[in-house]
Structure formats: structure tokens, C-alpha cells
């Protein structure tokens, strides 16, 4: 863990949970807190999974270690909630926000929280939440409540005879009926996971326990040498996978795709209808029913099966890394192709996301050039077609094609003749037309996927499995492509387009002397030297001296320029951590300058009624503060995207 990464994590923890991070004796000494208060603070950090803890079986001493990756993930809370809200709705995002706030939480505790109870219409003409708080309701809910109100006398009797914050006996059931489908939808996407005891152990302690358990097995003790080490490595990997597996089972369909996953209408740029991802493998007797029932604007599964109330759940950040990576790749595909093609690619990535637990198999990143190819699961072509919005015009960004020659594989087009019989009835003609339109749509879809498979990006890869056309994505190549683009963007902004040309030549050719580099890049010697000197001073290129003899004289020495992407990425990553820390520190400084004023605006009576209680000068100050805070937080979010590309993808 680097210096600036530690500084950034401290600032994030301070901003979210207060100044309770330091060695325990130092906290007791500096803050004058009692050991009991310090232990409570330590429990809060464990609750948020910000530290690992391990009690040794030998001496019984508890050891603690900072989980800096969990601390860093606090900065992604906004992006995570925005993604979930766009996919699954506001209520599911509220549920996930509550889980984020508590770190890890039991499902039975979520059922008792008033903010997660749905808002239901009362007979008094008001929208009353299950905890009794008034809310805002829509026109549809007004019509529903008007249907339940019979006369004015009944309204008065309800308003006077029952307290306003009371609810019907079935409100709790409605709360559970909405909470559990929301949790199931999060579990279906893999956005939440079941908390295991091993999740509170540091990776090093977990490996030590795994080695101890595997080496004590009878089938391993008899081995020696290389076979013994291979058995230990394989056993440790299996042990850790079993102990840390937090997958929430999905009932009888746990081995296939989850039932009930729906696409949000806002997921596509066009006004597409909400459409559930169809199952690839359904048990016999089950029908793939497209049920588009929603509770308000949020997703609600038709299955009323309750989840285990004793299950402890938390946010699965690794799965969100996969989802955020897919979004970044979809944006890159839109920049390189077209909007319609990017939506096709988004459908392919969405299906792959369901079967991809993490961005990488190993937590540490492999150096540039040593990464093996990592293909995703292969998705059949017809499955991608079913996931695409049927109203999306796939031929919009394609050159004009004669419908009669649209299907070059022998299938008839829209105007084709199926069997030469002109006396077919209307039903046969209609079914044939639907079949032909689907054939044409398959052809158009394959054209978009073929465009994505072109050099130099190679967004997708075509293959055949059991005679079926399938498409997959090679993520390691795309991750390298993203890293190169980000590094080139930074170099261009600091040194100009000529520097990008030099970097690309060095990345492609390796180590070059100045004369050879000048010939390839087609640049003047003076201009090339200036660019190389500036980039070397900033640390983006390196110079290696190779003497031709033992005297090591400058005249007998070759000077080779080279570009080390891994070192540059680490350097940029450290600078990014530092920049994020400075942004958060600046927010704290600006907040302290307006401390008394901001405390006034955060009062419950003022919040939401600023125009009523604040003067025009105070309103102007508040607007300036919010704009400044949004600017700094937006910069932190953009820097986090850079960290994701350089470190996580």
C-alpha cells in the first residue's frame, strides 16, 4: 500500500465515519477516549469491513490489519448507486444504499427499517409510509386511493378515529413483498453476497489457515518434493474458494441464469420497453414468461419466496467492477462504431456480466505482455437477439441492402417465396413473414457483431460451438487497450500530439536509439530531443546507457529510449491517489470556512425550505458552496474512473 493510497483511505474513512483510525494506544492517548469507547469504534470499523481481524490459535492474541481496498471503495458509492438505480429502480437503489451504510447487515434487520417500507395510500387521501411519514404520490396512486375512499364521513372517521401514523396490518407484508424481490434482484445480478467468516480475515491469514488445513490431510502428507507443493497449491486455492464463496443461491435455477432479471427502460438511449433477459436453460414444464409487472417505477419479481431472514449480506464490489468495466467498454465501442452497434455490444456484455464473477482471476495485476488471453463465456447469437430491444432499428447505421439478397445463406428474405405455392392461407403467410423478419434481424445483428470484431479494437470474437454461432469477449486485450488510451490521453494533454506519436513508436518497437527513433517517427532531431527531455523529466520515458566497451566513455556508449507502461501506470496511479486526496482535503477546508453557515442549512427545519429561512445573500453563498462541492466531487469521480482502468480492469 503506497503513501498516497493510505492518505486517501484515511480521508475517506474520516469523511464517512469520523477520526477513528490509528493504533489503539495512540487513539486512547490522543483522543482521551476510554478503552471501552475505542473498542466500540473498532467494532464500527469491523462492521464496515474496513479492517481485518484474526485471533491466533497459539497465543490467543487478536491481530488487526487495514482493508484499504474496502476503504477505497467508499469513493465509488455514488457510481454504484447510480448504476443500480438505472438498472433496477429507485427502491432497489435505496436498499443497496442501506446495505452500503451498514457495511454488512442481516436481512431480518432490513425488514425493520422504516425507510425501506413502501409508501402506501391511506384513506385520508395522503400517502403514508409504513413508518407513518407522509410522502409524495403519483397520479396513478391518487386514482387508486380515490377508488378506496367511499364517502367523506369515512374519511373523517379515519382521520379522527385512527392516528395518522398508523397503518393497516398488511403493510408489513407489503414491505416484505417489496424488500425481498429487491434483494433477489440484487442477488441475481451478483451485486450482493452472503458474508462468510473468512471475509473478515486478511488474505495472508486465510492462506496460512488454508496451508495448515491442506497439509494436515492424509492424502497430502505422504507426498514429497514437487508433487507435495502442487498438491498444496491446488488445495489452498480450493479451500479459499470454498471459504470465501458468497454466492446467494437462486433456488432451483441456481445453476442457470436467474429468473426475473429485467432490463430497465433507461438502460438504452432509445425509448425501449422493459424486457426480461430470457433463460437459456429452463427445466421441463417451466415457461419463460415475460412478466413486466412493476411496483411503481421499480422492479418487483413475481416470485413471493422470502429470503432467509438470518442471512448476513454485504455489497459485492468485485461484481460492480465488472459492471463498471462493461459500461466503459460500451462507451468505447460507441466512440469507435455507432450508437446502435454500441447498444448491441451492451446487450452482449450484459449477458456476459451475469456469468462473470470478477474482472480478473487473480487479485494482483500481471505485468504488461505477460497476461494470458481471458475469454468470457460464449453467448449464442439467438440469446443476444432476444435481449435486444425489439424496437431498436438495427439497419439504421448499416449501408442500404437489397431485401431480396439480404440472406446470403439461402434463407428467403422479406419478399422471398417459401414453397412456390401462391394459395397459402393468411395465417401461414403471417407466420412466414414473422420468421423472415427474424431471419433478417439475425443477419443485421451478426453484421453489427462482425463490425465489433474488426481490428484494432476486437471488441468481440466469433466462434462455433456444437454447430451454433456464439460470441465472446477477450477482456485482457481490451483492458490493455483502455490503459494505453488513458496513458496516451494524459501524455497528449501534457506534451502534445507529437509525444503520443513517440510513445506509440516506443511501445511498438521497444528500445530505440535517437537516430532510429527519428527515422520511424519522421520528426526533426531538435524537436524530438525536446519532447524526449520533457517526458523523461516527468517520468514517462526512460533512457538506458549501453557501453560498447569496458571504458564506458560517452562517445562509445549507446543511449536507448524505451517506454515502460507498467511503471508509468504505477506512477500515474500514485499521482491520481494524491490528486483525489487533495480534492477531499480542499472540500474539508472549504467546509470549515462555512462551518456555522452549513450547520444552519442542515437543520431539519431549514433543509428543503432554504428560500423561506435564508436571505438572498445566504442563498447565493449556499449555491456557490454546492457548485464548488459538486465540481470537486465530480473531479474525484473522474479520477476514480482512471484508477479503475489502471488498477482494476
Swiss-Prot record:
InterPro entries, sorted: POLR3C_WHD, RNA_pol_III_RPC82-rel_HTH, RNA_pol_III_Rpc82_C, RPC3, WH-like_DNA-bd_sf, WH_DNA-bd_sf
Gene Ontology biological process terms in this record: DNA-templated transcription
Keywords: DNA-directed RNA polymerase, Nucleus, Transcription, Zinc
Origin superkingdom: Eukaryota
Keyword Nucleus: yes
Region (Leucine-zipper), start-end ranges: 576-597
Entry's localization field: Nucleus
SUPFAM superfamilies, A to Z: Winged helix' DNA-binding domain (SSF46785)
Keyword Nucleus listed: yes
GO cellular component, one term: RNA polymerase III complex
Signal peptide (from-to): none
GO MF terms, alphabetically ordered: single-stranded DNA binding
Region (Disordered): 135-176, 266-293, 409-432
A Pfam match: POLR3C_WHD
Quaternary structure and partners: Component of the RNA polymerase III (Pol III) complex consisting of 17 subunits.
Entry similarity comment: Belongs to the RNA polymerase beta chain family.
Reported function: DNA-dependent RNA polymerase catalyzes the transcription of DNA into RNA using the four ribonucleoside triphosphates as substrates. Specific core component of RNA polymerase III which synthesizes small RNAs, such as 5S rRNA and tRNAs.
Protein name stated in the entry: DNA-directed RNA polymerase III subunit rpc3
Organism encoding this protein: Ajellomyces capsulatus (strain NAm1 / WU24) (Darling's disease fungus)
Top-level taxonomy: Eukaryota, Fungi, Dikarya, Ascomycota, Pezizomycotina
Gene of this entry: RPC82
Amino acid at each position: 500500500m503506497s503513501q498516497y493510497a493510505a492518505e486517501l483511505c484515511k480521508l475517506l474513512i474520516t469523511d464517512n465515519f469520523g477520526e477513528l483510525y490509528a493504533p489503539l494506544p495512540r487513539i486512547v492517548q490522543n483522543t482521551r477516549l476510554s478503552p471501552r469507547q475505542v473498542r466500540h469504534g473498532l467494532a464500527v470499523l469491523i462492521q464496515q469491513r474496513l479492517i481485518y481481524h484474526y485471533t491466533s490459535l497459539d497465543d490467543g492474541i487478536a491481530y488487526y490489519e487495514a482493508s484499504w481496498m474496502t476503504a477505497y471503495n467508499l469513493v465509488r458509492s455514488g457510481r454504484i448507486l447510480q448504476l443500480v438505480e438505472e438498472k433496477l429502480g429507485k427502491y432497489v437503489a435505496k436498499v443497496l444504499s442501506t446495505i452500503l451504510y451498514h457495511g454488512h447487515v442481516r436481512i431480518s434487520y432490513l425488514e425493520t427499517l422504516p425507510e425501506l417500507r413502501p409508501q402506501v395510500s391511506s384513506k385520508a387521501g395522503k400517502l403514508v409510509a409504513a413508518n407513518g411519514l407522509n410522502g409524495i404520490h403519483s397520479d396513478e396512486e391518487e386514482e387508486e386511493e380515490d377508488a378506496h375512499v367511499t364517502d367523506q364521513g369515512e374519511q373523517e372517521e379515519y382521520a379522527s378515529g385512527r392516528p395518522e401514523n398508523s397503518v393497516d396490518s398488511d403493510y408489513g407484508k407489503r414491505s416484505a413483498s417489496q424488500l425481498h424481490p429487491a434483494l433477489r434482484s440484487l442477488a441475481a445480478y451478483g451485486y450482493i453476497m452472503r458474508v462468510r467468516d473468512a471475509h473478515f480475515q486478511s488474505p495472508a491469514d486465510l492462506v496460512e489457515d488454508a496451508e495448515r488445513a491442506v497439509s494436515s490431510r492424509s492424502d497430502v502428507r505422504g507426498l514429497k518434493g514437487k508433487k507435495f507443493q502442487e498438491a498444496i497449491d491446488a488445495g489452498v486455492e480450493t479451500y479459499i474458494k470454498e471459504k470465501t464463496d458468497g454466492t446467494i443461491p437462486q433456488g432451483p435455477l441456481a445453476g442457470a441464469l436467474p429468473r426475473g432479471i429485467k432490463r430497465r427502460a433507461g438502460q438504452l438511449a432509445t425509448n425501449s420497453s422493459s424486457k426480461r433477459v430470457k433463460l437459456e436453460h429452463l427445466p421441463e414444464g417451466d415457461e419463460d414468461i415475460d412478466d413486466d409487472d412493476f411496483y411503481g417505477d421499480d422492479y418487483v419479481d413475481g416470485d413471493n419466496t422470502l429470503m432467509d431472514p438470518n442471512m448476513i449480506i454485504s455489497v459485492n464490489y468485485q461484481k460492480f467492477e465488472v459492471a463498471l468495466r462493461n459500461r466503459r467498454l460500451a462507451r468505447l465501442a460507441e466512440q469507435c462504431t455507432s450508437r446502435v452497434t454500441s447498444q448491441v455490444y451492451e446487450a452482449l456484455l450484459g449477458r456476459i456480466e451475469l456469468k462473470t464473477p470478477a474482472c480478473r482471476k487473480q487479485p494482483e495485476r500481471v505485468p504488461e505482455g505477460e497476461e494470458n488471453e481471458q475469454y468470457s463465456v460464449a453467448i449464442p447469437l439467438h440469446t443476444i437477439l432476444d435481449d435486444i430491444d425489439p424496437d431498436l432499428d438495427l439497419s439504421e447505421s448499416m449501408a442500404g441492402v437489397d431485401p431480396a439478397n439480404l440472406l446470403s445463406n439461402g434463407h428467403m428474405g422479406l419478399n422471398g417465396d417459401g414453397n412456390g405455392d401462391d394459395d397459402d392461407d393468411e395465417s401461414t403467410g403471417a407466420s412466414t413473414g414473422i420468421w423472415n423478419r427474424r431471419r433478417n434481424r439475425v443477419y443485421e445483428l451478426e453484421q453489427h457483431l462482425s463490425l465489433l470484431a474488426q481490428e484494432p479494437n476486437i471488441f468481440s470474437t466469433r466462434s462455433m460451438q456444437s454447430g451454433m454461432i456464439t460470441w465472446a469477449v477477450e477482456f485482457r486485450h481490451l483492458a490493455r487497450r483502455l490503459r494505453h488510451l488513458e496513458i496516451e490521453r494524459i501524455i497528449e494533454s501534457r506534451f502534445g500530439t507529437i509525444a503520443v506519436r513517440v510513445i506509440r513508436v516506443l511501445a511498438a518497437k521497444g528500445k530505440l536509439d535517437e537516430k532510429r527513433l527519428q527515422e520511424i517517427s519522421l520528426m526533426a532531431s531538435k524537436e524530438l530531443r525536446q519532447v524526449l527531455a520533457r517526458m523523461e523529466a516527468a517520468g514517462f520515458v526512460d533512457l538506458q546507457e549501453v557501453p560498447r566497451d569496458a571504458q564506458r566513455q560517452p562517445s562509445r556508449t549507446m543511449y536507448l529510449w524505451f517506454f515502460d507502461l507498467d511503471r508509468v501506470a504505477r506512477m500515474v496511479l500514485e499521482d491520481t491517489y494524491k490528486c483525489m486526496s487533495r480534492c477531499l482535503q480542499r472540500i474539508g477546508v472549504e467546509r470549515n470556512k462555512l462551518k456555522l453557515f452549513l450547520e444552519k442549512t442542515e437543520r431539519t427545519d431549514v433543509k428543503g425550505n432554504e428560500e423561506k429561512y435564508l436571505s438572498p445573500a445566504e442563498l447565493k453563498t449556499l449555491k456557490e458552496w454546492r457548485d464548488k462541492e459538486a465540481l470537486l466531487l465530480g473531479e474525484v469521480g473522474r479520477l476514480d474512473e482512471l484508477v479503475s482502468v489502471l488498477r482494476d480492469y
